[in-house]
Amino acid sequence: QHACLQAIAPELLTGGIGRLIHAVSAEHQDLTRSRQRHAVLVKVHAASLNPLDWHYMRGTPYIMRMQAGVGAPKDSAMGVDFSGTVAAVGKNVTRFKAGDEVFGGRDGAFAEFLSVGENKALTLKPANMTFEQAAAVPIAAITALQALRDKGGIRPGQKVLINGASGGVGTFAVQIARSFGAEVTGVCS
């Protein structure tokens, strides 16, 4: 598999997909999305399951069916949160290089490989985190950050109550609120 990836990744990243489409096995179909010059091809090492995935699979609340599909999911590539190693980069990518350990959020995170835009939800994995730990961060942390900073307008000295402080989003909310200098009270069951 690794030799196959090395052989076809440059063609995929430069748009030579027509010559290679039949050479890519079914399990590597996500590689075909890597033809963009600003794409980062990630070999996924870990992916986490979060409520978004569960709602997507269950089709509840019913509004999810508009995106997911009425009878069954339209897209079999499930998952959002992931971590892994950069396998290849498009010719215009400057922030990442092959071998970098990264984590982020993108539909299809349960796949073996993902193509992620360089300027999308992708960043270097801290060296002190395992791949599994990093895969648990993206959606929960982004949700907490957006709620506190963007919607809540958090500021130093502000008193903040975090309901559900022991959950996925709540754990990040406590840490993020503290990093903004807020006085935090956490509530959990």
Give a label for each model feature:
Residues 57, 83-106, 180-181:
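A glycine-/small-residue-rich N-terminal strand-loop-strand element
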Residues 33-83:
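N-terminal glycine-rich beta->alpha transition that marks the start or flank
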Residues 40, 102-103, 160:
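Generic structural signal for buried aliphatic residues
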Residues 134-189:
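Mid-domain Rossmann-like dinucleotide-binding core that forms the NAD(H)/NADP(H) cofactor-binding site
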